């Protein structure tokens, strides 16, 4: 599982499977990104729960139907590891550990000096810094069983998974190429989704910290309103103002991420200088407006006009 800032071939189909939706996109070119094809299919409740496949057979049948409809049969695919099953963390290791021995050392230390929320990880590492006393590495770890099950799902649906990606890096690539990047920034990248918020801090183009924040409230309060046979929008069935008030808990957790970076990770030497907000949350515009009034940092999003398409696409997702 190799996580890199820059992705590979345009011809690879990019696939996202979330608790409530499957989305795909195929690019004609990457810089600037030009979308050639895209599509989405909303899932019944309970097929995927917190990133874990709960009904494998039903999901395979749904995905197989999507593959036929989208005409991506037997294509190579890049898929996202579920955020809820992912850890990004800076780790210090002894300086005398050779670079080609780091992976073995980490496996030995799992459960001892290195603790993860799952027992069997698959991981990748990036060397950050070597000092007189230690090496600092960036650890990307995912739950191996979950990643393997998604790969098996894709294979059984007649696709060829060639790469597992993560949403913080995939979104940062988009931000990187959009022309908004300042190399001096200490960036908080926030992805607001229907049930969860992913908050990642980037320094020198590397994600040095990530936290998943569960949004208060029940997914049962949302219903799908179909635009056509292929797609739709999620509609909140309760009181919108009450829901926006519930997001106070989410903002409190974001405050804690900002404080943790300033006082613990950077030892009061740095603080977040910019916040970029994206995601597929139906109330994203209201959320961005609230964050602009709440935080002293510049709060922005990736310009929608930056992503172009080769033709009029039948796809109303916030990402396209």
Where are these regions (language model features)?
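Active-site neighborhood for divalent-cation/phosphate handling
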Residues: 76, 80-178, 304-308
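Non-catalytic, solvent-exposed interaction/assembly segments
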Residues: 1-109, 133, 148-151, 158
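Adenine-nucleotide phosphate-binding core of ATP-dependent small-molecule kinases
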Residues: 216-272, 280-282
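Short glycine-rich phosphate-binding loop at a beta-alpha junction
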Residues: 72-84, 154, 163, 265-280
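Glycine-rich phosphate-binding/hydrolytic loop that grips phosphoryl groups
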Residues: 300-320
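Phosphate-interacting basic helix/loop segments used at nucleotide- and nucleic-acid interfaces
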Residues: 58-70, 175, 182-185, 261
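Glycine-rich phosphate-binding loops at beta-strand->alpha-helix junctions
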Residues: 269-297
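Small-residue (GG/TT-enriched) beta-loop-alpha framework at ligand/catalytic clefts
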Residues: 13-14, 19-37, 79, 131-239
């Amino acid at each position: 599982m190799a996580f890199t800032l820059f992705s590979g071939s345009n011809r690879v189909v990019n696939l996202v499977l979330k608790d409530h939706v499957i989305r795909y996109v195929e690019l004609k070119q990457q810089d600037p990104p030009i979308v050639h094809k895209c599509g989405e299919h909303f899932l019944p409740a309970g097929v995927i729960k917190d990133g874990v496949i709960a009904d494998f057979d039903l999901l395979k049948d749904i995905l197989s139907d999507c593959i036929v409809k989208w005409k991506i049969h037997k294509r190579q695919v890049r898929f996202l590891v579920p955020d809820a099953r992912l850890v990004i963390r800076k780790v210090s290791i002894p300086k005398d550990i050779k670079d080609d021995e780091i992976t073995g050392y980490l496996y030995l230390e799992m459960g001892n000096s290195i603790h993860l929320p799952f027992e069997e990880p698959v991981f990748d590492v990036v060397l950050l810094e070597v000092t007189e006393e230690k090496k600092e590495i960036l650890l990307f770890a995912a739950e191996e069983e979950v990643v393997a099950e998604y790969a098996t799902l894709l294979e059984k649906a007649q696709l060829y998974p060639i790469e597992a990606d993560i949403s913080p890096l995939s979104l940062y690539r988009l931000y990187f190429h959009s022309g908004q990047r300042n190399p001096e920034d200490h960036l908080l990248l926030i992805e607001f989704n229907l049930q969860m918020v992913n908050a990642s801090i980037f320094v020198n183009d590397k994600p040095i910290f990530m936290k998943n924040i569960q949004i208060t409230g029940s997914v049962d309060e949302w219903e799908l309103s179909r635009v056509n046979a292929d797609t739709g929008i999620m509609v909140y069935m309760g009181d919108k103002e009450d829901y926006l008030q519930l997001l106070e808990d989410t903002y409190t957790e974001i405050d804690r991420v900002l404080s943790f970076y300033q006082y613990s990770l950077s030892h009061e030497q740095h603080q977040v200088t910019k916040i970029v907000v994206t995601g597929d949350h139906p109330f994203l515009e209201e959320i961005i407006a609230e964050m602009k009034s709440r935080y002293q940092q510049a709060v922005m999003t990736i310009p929608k006009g930056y992503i172009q398409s080769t033709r009029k696409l039948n796809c109303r997702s916030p990402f396209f």
